[in-house]
């Protein structure tokens, strides 16, 4: 399985970037995981870049209105989507205005991290942490804090 986190916007905040890098490193002990940052811009420009970043993958749009999943269901969903096709699962996070509607509509599934609205950079950290948690759950390992 390979995971892709494609997100609009660059994370410049050093502590936030360090936390993301820590969890990405932990995920990579289990599976390949790429993070792709896409420059923010109008939907007509961002949409094709997100589509290219997720080409050939099962695509999960991360949105407030998506399916609300607990950690166990999230892990099971990662495993289910990862076992299909090429074994690549791409998680898409939009910018401040969310994902372009055509990108959301083309996704294979839509998930939510919370009914709360997070700044998109914080949502990316929460997603990456949940992907690490999913890896530990799928292997029956204790979660390393």
Curated annotation (Swiss-Prot):
Residue numbers binding S-adenosyl-L-methionine: 94, 113-118
Keyword Methyltransferase: yes
Keywords, ordered alphabetically: Cytoplasm, Methyltransferase, rRNA processing, S-adenosyl-L-methionine, Transferase
TM annotation in the entry: none
Cysteines paired by S-S bonds: none
Entry GO CC: cytoplasm
The EC number(s) this enzyme carries: 2.1.1.177
Compartment(s): Cytoplasm
Top-level lineage group: Bacteria
Top EC category: transferase
Major localization class: cytoplasm
One Pfam short name: SPOUT_MTase
Any coiled-coil regions, as ranges: none
InterPro entries: Alpha/beta_knot_MTases (IPR029028), RlmH-like (IPR003742), tRNA_m1G_MTases_N (IPR029026)
Entry's Gene Ontology molecular function annotations: rRNA (pseudouridine-N3-)-methyltransferase activity
CDD domains, per database record: RlmH-like
Reactions that this protein is recorded to catalyse: pseudouridine(1915) in 23S rRNA + S-adenosyl-L-methionine = N(3)-methylpseudouridine(1915) in 23S rRNA + S-adenosyl-L-homocysteine + H(+)
Record's subunit section: Homodimer.
Family of this protein: Belongs to the RNA methyltransferase RlmH family.
Functional note: Specifically methylates the pseudouridine at position 1915 (m3Psi1915) in 23S rRNA.
Name of this protein: Ribosomal RNA large subunit methyltransferase H
Organism annotation: Sorangium cellulosum (strain So ce56)
Gene: rlmH
């Amino acid at each position: 399985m390979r995971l892709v986190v494609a997100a609009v916007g660059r994370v410049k905040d050093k502590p936030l970037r360090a936390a993301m890098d820590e969890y990405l490193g932990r995920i990579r002990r289990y599976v390949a995981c790429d993070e792709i940052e896409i420059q923010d811009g109008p939907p007509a420009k961002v949409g094709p870049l997100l589509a290219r970043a997720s080409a050939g993958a099962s695509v999960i749009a991360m949105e407030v209105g998506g399916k609300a999943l607990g950690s166990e269901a999230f892990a099971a969903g990662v495993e289910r989507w990862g076992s299909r096709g090429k074994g690549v699962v791409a998680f898409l996070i939009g910018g401040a205005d969310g994902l372009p509607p055509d990108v959301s509509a083309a996704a294979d599934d839509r998930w939510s991290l919370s009914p709360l609205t997070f700044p998109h950079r914080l949502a990316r950290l929460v997603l990456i942490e949940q992907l690490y948690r999913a890896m530990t759950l799928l292997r029956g390992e204790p979660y390393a804090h």
